[in-house]
């Protein structure tokens, strides 16, 4: 792996994903200073960054001062979402309503995000709140759920916490008849594929400025 000083001169497409530290204050996380430097670095070295779950919370806090808050109980399972603006390419091909996984103890209140003029909310849930948004014409993408989860991820989290004796509810809309002994029903794959395809097509490949040698050129950004 390249060292930090070597990576700093390179350019990438980037996904900042979640971490099991969401119940800590951001500044209490051991690597918070390093993470903020990486987030700032993306402004000049990454065409578009997708921030997932805690990564979305961290970026909304770092860039816009939006604070997270604890939920009374874990938001866990599949939740229905609606699309807010179909003219935006990121949601092209989305169903009017779609399911996506969530697994978190905290949230950024959607009213706080709505009040932030820099962030456009593209999809939300009556039950799970903010799900998908963007800023800077798509240079920053925020996903509060986990579309990347495979069929068994929520199942693994449920049985892990149950085996530890932790308070955990059966993930919503996930098992047939809410029976955790059955194989989970995979209901979000097409949405996830659509989201990542749109992101890479419309916000990375089509807009990354390239030099003649094939390397991205950010000199004009």
Where are these regions (language model features)?
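A basic- and aromatic-enriched beta-loop-alpha substructure that forms the phosphate/nucleotide-
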Residues: 1-2, 24
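Cysteine-nucleophile active-site neighborhood
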Residues: 12-85
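Amide-donor transfer/coupling interface in amidating biosynthetic enzymes
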Residues: 2-6, 76-221
